[in-house]
């Protein structure tokens, strides 16, 4: 069965890593972006970019529609990850963490608590900047996954 990597691509810092690591593997890459992130950059043959409307969650809905059981999905959106855990081969964060049924609920709970703080006018610490170490961790985890398929 054919494997695709589907990337929630509007703000994903590992797009180029995925493209490089999948070259010559027979794995296809689909990058989903909203039209506000349109680019005319030419991609390799194994890469396809799908643009969707700019509406809230439009990219997420399209990913859910396209994803199938042998796919790898890369997203930082915990809500999207929770919808896909039982649908695809692997759902992973761009820092290399794998979403599982045993860790997604605590991530969703933390997201909810942070939203409550923001609604009350409070602030919370955001994620740290993406580093070279994060990229290397992602690439290592991603290589392991594509070598298993």
Curated annotation (Swiss-Prot):
What this protein is called in its record is: UPF0178 protein SE_0451
Q: Name one Pfam family in it.
A: DUF188
Family label: Belongs to the UPF0178 family.
Which NCBIfam families does this chain map to? PRK00124.1 (NF001095)
Q: Would you say which domain of life the source belongs to?
A: Bacteria
Q: Which InterPro entries match?
A: UPF0178
